[in-house]
């Protein structure tokens, strides 16, 4: 077997990661087979030979065979980097080294990956990287940059300067501490060395099957795909082909970031033939005859559509069109190693420390947004709203830079927040339900961001009470996303209150369900309302197919309310519950309640208003509420409560009493206006003496006797949509 030595190439590493994406096996699963299972025969002490290594890869990657060039390159890489002279002579590799490497790739901590790579290049095992070892690192970085299609002609001196900067004490060598410090703050070492591989713009189309309701022509063979027939369309550039033409298609034109200094700051048009859905030229305003052949051009960034003949009249520079306020053009994103030395020095003091290690592709790229714009960070939950989430995901990937759009099912919101961390004046759009919004807000809370961005909501699925209150509607129904983005551009910021919930259980043998959240964004309830929600939740978990529309949900809710009214599980609630508002007891003795709701926003259960409508007093409502709040932390006077309007930024909660399940069902189905207004306050405490149903933001649970304290936590900037346009002339007068 050849003893050619060398590190695994970037392309081989990319192929390895692709295999790992589709495998469900863990390293621990494979090790068991080698230690005491069917693969034990391949063990030679604590090492395995090439044949055993191939078996390891086949089992771990769940494939029938691994390309010989890949398995050989990996095997030789382990021999070069990790093994002693003895193991090299025996033509084996240490199984512990192999398992350690793949464990790190599975999801190891960044600091572990950094330490691992340090030892990989420290070939003489003296604990420092000398000049020859640093040169070896630079060579590997150059290979990686070439694989990523960066302009390598300008890169070598930059990398040499960067490696000098890592030598913080000027000793002429790099210690492990200096290596870890650099990787944790300013230098994307893992990406540059090929251990993080999501940077490649590889020219591959992101195909999705599409059935075309009107004549469309194949970008490759230029013949008709057929009316009502299915073809393939690229999510990123709208390049469209027959299924059988996809293998021969030209590479995707979309490059998501600048790969050379000369490309930074100047965005040019990227024209793709066809895709002119409007049928009208944005240059001459005449029709584009799209029904007869493959004609016209569209720009993937500004989305202008023009005749082929109008191209010479168009300038080279692209301003990103109507959505420029939201878009990060490729010219605004570039490898951080291409930043000047001064910029890197500044970022050393502004970015994270080794105590906050969480490296990813985001550290490899730097964002320098176009001035006077508000780049949009989009989070999409593809599971929300059936298939709506998936459609919204690929639509935004076309309308914006794909690097602005994050699939929450992949890695959650953290990668997106890290990527935008240093961007000024950006906004966030959350595409999902109230639960998804809560997840994003909680992550922002924990992220310790230098700038807390305002958050807008594109509601998917049912419910969506927060989106309703912020004027984004009760659910996305296929509206034009470009128009929604223009509405977002015109939105206003409101600082929404958020509340902490502390549940202190009493000593009891009963076991409580886990509390779903520690923060209230929408509402908290105890009693009949939560009991109905709990039944609804259990049934939906068992039979999700029965809860796939708003109308079905309303009917099911009404049915559960009816059955709850028969059993009255929360009757005489005041006998097992006491309430304190700002330290003062709330008198419930004259009321026959089966539930209490604490509201941060006026909408619950998909649009129900438990507080009810308020006759508008003369003057500014927000000002009146503030005046009332200034007079007293607690408002319980019924006459004053009649004039109080819910305000999600007044640091006050509305407390509502509910008589029973029938009343709750009537409110939910709009047959009754509201419950009983009990109080408006800034702090509330419940003491319970028996197990009761409770819910936070629509997530119910059964709670054993306890004390519950609700206090103000903070405020989060949220974006409120523009007011709805009036549908008649007289509406302008209101």
Swiss-Prot record:
Q: Where is Ca(2+) 2 annotated to bind?
A: 167, 169, 171, 173, 178
* GO MF entry, a single one: ATP-dependent diacylglycerol kinase activity
Localisation: Cytoplasm, Cytosol
Q: How far does the signal peptide extend, from start to end residue? A: none
Q: Which SMART domains match?
A: C1 (SM00109), DAGKa (SM00045), DAGKc (SM00046), EFh (SM00054)
The subunit field of the Swiss-Prot or TrEMBL record says: Monomer.
What is this protein called in UniProt?
A: Diacylglycerol kinase alpha
What organism does the record attribute this protein to? Sus scrofa (Pig)
Encoding gene (name) = DGKA
């Amino acid at each position: 077997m050849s003893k050619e030595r060398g590190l695994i190439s970037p392309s081989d590493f990319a192929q390895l990661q692709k295999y790992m994406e589709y495998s469900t096996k863990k390293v621990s699963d494979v090790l068991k087979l080698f230690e005491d299972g069917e693969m034990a025969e391949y063990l030679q002490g604590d090492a395995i030979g090439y044949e055993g290594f191939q078996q390891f890869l086949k089992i771990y990657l769940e494939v029938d065979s691994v390309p010989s060039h890949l398995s050989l390159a990996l095997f030789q890489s382990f021999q070069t980097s990790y093994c002693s002279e003895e193991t090299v002579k025996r033509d084996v590799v240490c199984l512990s080294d192999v398992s350690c490497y793949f464990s790190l790739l599975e999801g190891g901590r960044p600091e572990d990956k950094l330490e691992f790579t340090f030892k990989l290049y420290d070939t003489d095992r003296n604990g420092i990287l000398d000049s020859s070892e640093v040169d070896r690192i630079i060579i590997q970085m150059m290979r990686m940059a070439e694989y990523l299609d960066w302009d390598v002609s300008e890169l070598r001196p930059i990398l040499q300067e960067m490696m000098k900067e890592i030598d913080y004490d000027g000793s002429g060598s790099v210690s492990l501490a200096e290596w870890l410090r650099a990787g944790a703050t300013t230098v994307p070492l893992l990406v540059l060395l090929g251990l993080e591989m999501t940077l490649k713009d590889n020219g591959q189309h992101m195909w999705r099957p599409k059935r075309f309701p009107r004549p469309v022509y194949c970008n490759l063979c230029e013949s008709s795909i057929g009316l009502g027939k299915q073809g393939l369309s690229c999510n990123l550039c709208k390049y469209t082909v027959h299924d059988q033409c996809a293998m021969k298609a030209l590479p995707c034109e979309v490059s998501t970031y600048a790969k050379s200094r000369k490309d930074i700051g100047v965005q040019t048009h990227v024209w793709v033939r066809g895709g002119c859905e409007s049928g009208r030229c944005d240059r001459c305003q005449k029709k584009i005859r799209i029904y007869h052949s493959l004609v016209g051009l569209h720009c993937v960034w500004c989305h202008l559509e023009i005749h082929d003949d109008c191209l010479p009249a168009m300038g080279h520079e692209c301003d990103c069109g109507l959505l420029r306020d939201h878009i990060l053009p490729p010219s605004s994103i570039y490898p951080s190693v291409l930043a000047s030395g001064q910029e890197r020095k500044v970022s050393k003091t502004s970015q994270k420390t080794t105590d906050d290690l969480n490296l990813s592709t985001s550290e490899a790229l730097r964002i320098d947004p176009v001035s006077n714009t508000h780049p949009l960070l989009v989070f999409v939950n593809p599971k929300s709203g059936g298939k709506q989430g998936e459609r919204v995901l690929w639509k935004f990937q076309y309308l914006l830079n794909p690097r602005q759009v994050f699939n929450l099912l992949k890695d959650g919101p953290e990668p997106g927040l890290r990527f935008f961390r240093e961007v000024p004046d950006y906004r966030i759009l959350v595409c999902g339900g109230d639960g998804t919004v809560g997840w994003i807000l909680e992550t922002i809370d924990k992220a310790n961001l230098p700038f807390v961005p305002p958050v807008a909501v594109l509601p998917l699925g049912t419910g969506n009470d927060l989106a309703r209150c912020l004027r984004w509607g009760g659910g996305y129904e296929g509206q034009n996303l470009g128009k929604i983005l223009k509405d977002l551009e015109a939105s206003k910021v409101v600082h929404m209150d958020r509340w902490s919930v502390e549940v202190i259980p009493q000593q009891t043998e009963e076991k409580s369900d886990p509390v779903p959240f520690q923060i209230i964004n929408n509402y908290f309830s105890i009693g009949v309302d939560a009991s109905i929600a709990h039944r609804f939740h259990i049934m939906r978990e068992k039979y999700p197919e029965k809860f796939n529309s708003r109308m079905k949900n309303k009917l099911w809710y009404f049915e559960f309310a009816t059955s709850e009214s028969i059993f009255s599980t929360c009757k005489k609630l005041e006998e097992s519950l006491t309430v304190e508002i700002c330290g003062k007891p709330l008198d419930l003795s004259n009321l026959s309640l089966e539930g209490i709701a604490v509201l941060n926003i006026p909408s619950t259960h998909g649009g129900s208003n438990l507080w009810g409508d308020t006759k508008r007093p003369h003057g500014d409502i927000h000002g009146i509420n503030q005046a009332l709040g200034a007079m007293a932390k607690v408002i319980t006077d019924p006459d004053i409560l009649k004039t109080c309007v819910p305000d999600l930024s007044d640091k006050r909660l509305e407390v509502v009493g509910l008589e029973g399940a029938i009343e709750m069902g009537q409110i939910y189905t709009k047959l009754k206006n509201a419950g009983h207004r009990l109080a408006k306050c800034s702090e509330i405490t419940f003491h319970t003496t028996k197990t009761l149903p409770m819910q936070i933001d629509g997530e119910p649970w059964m709670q054993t006797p306890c004390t519950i304290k609700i206090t103000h936590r903070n405020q989060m900037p949220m974006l409120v949509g523009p007011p709805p346009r009036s549908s008649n002339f007289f509406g302008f007068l209101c």
